[in-house]
């Protein structure tokens, strides 16, 4: 058969996360500290946004849309973020408002549904510090520029690039390790699963279906065979 008549189909991608992108907690904290040293105000204003991706597993658009009334931030203990809207960047010709950013419902959910995400005390403290230092935009959004506008994707990607150069070794900078801000979310979900958080609970926090989550993060789960073997052995005893 002539080659020009052969139908070639690209291999299907399962969307699985490459475990090489996943940072450990020490690396994540070093990166967040490095973010605060980037620029006069851009890095300090974005540190808490990146922290939301790591400690709460938020998608970048979910963090960008976060408002003060979405956050319960007690002086001590765990807090709660209730996600209602995301703020993805797109061409302003295709938004309802005509702006570059537009409010959308949560990914994979009906517009009127919300997603509660418990947040650890470390993130609560970071968010409280952020609010003390920068306040909010007029509409309550937490993460905005000095002029009250949303950060563009290219702006926070550039901050992240500079933070990696500050926090990581030269070899790590050239590696896939935390190459994108989104990889902080991957690190969060991987940590939850490896810590033994039950899959349905981890999926609810991450805004995933259980089957999708386990497929996407299968390569990032350590030692599950040994754990399973021990549980079976204990049950047979």
Task: Give short role names for the model-derived ranges.
Residues 1-66, 76-78, 102, 110-114, ...:
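Basic, Lys/Arg- and aromatic-enriched nucleic-acid-binding interface segment
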Residues 17, 24, 32, 84, ...:
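Residue-level detector of conserved, well-ordered beta-strand and adjacent loop positions
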Residues 4-11, 25, 36, 65-132, ...:
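Conserved tyrosine-mediated DNA breakage-rejoining catalytic core shared by Y-recombinases
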Residues 71, 87-89, 199, 206-231:
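Catalytic-site neighborhood detector that most strongly recognizes the C-terminal catalytic loop/helix
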Residues 14, 108, 179, 222-225:
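Short linear motifs centered on Gly/Pro in flexible linkers and helix caps
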Residues 232-237:
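Intrinsically disordered, low-complexity basic tails/linkers immediately adjacent to helix-turn-helix/homeobox/MYB/SANT
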Residues 33-46, 56, 117, 125, ...:
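Short, basic (Lys/Arg/His-rich) helix/loop patches that form interaction surfaces
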């Amino acid at each position: 058969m002539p080659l020009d008549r052969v139908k070639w189909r690209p291999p299907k991608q399962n969307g699985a996360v490459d475990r090489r992108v996943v940072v450990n907690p020490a690396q994540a904290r070093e990166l967040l500290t490095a973010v605060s040293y980037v620029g006069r105000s851009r890095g300090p204003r974005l540190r808490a946004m990146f922290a939301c991706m790591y400690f709460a597993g938020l998608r970048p658009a979910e963090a960008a849309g976060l408002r003060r009334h979405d956050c319960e931030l007690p002086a001590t203990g765990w807090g709660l973020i209730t996600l209602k809207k995301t703020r993805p960047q797109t061409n302003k010709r295709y938004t309802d408002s005509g702006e570059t950013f537009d409010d959308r419902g949560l990914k994979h959910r009906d517009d009127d549904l919300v997603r509660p995400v418990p947040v650890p005390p470390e993130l609560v403290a970071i968010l409280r510090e952020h609010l003390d230092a920068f306040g909010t935009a007029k509409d309550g959004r937490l993460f905005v520029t000095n002029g009250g506008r949303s950060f563009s994707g290219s702006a926070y990607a550039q901050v992240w690039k500079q933070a990696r150069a500050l926090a990581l070794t030269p070899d790590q900078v050239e590696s896939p390790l935390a190459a994108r801000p989104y990889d902080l979310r991957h690190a969060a979900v991987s940590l939850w699963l490896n810590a033994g958080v039950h899959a349905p609970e981890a999926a609810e926090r991450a805004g995933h279906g259980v089957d999708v989550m386990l497929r996407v993060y299968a390569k990032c789960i350590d030692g599950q065979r040994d754990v399973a073997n021990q549980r079976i052995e204990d049950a047979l005893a």
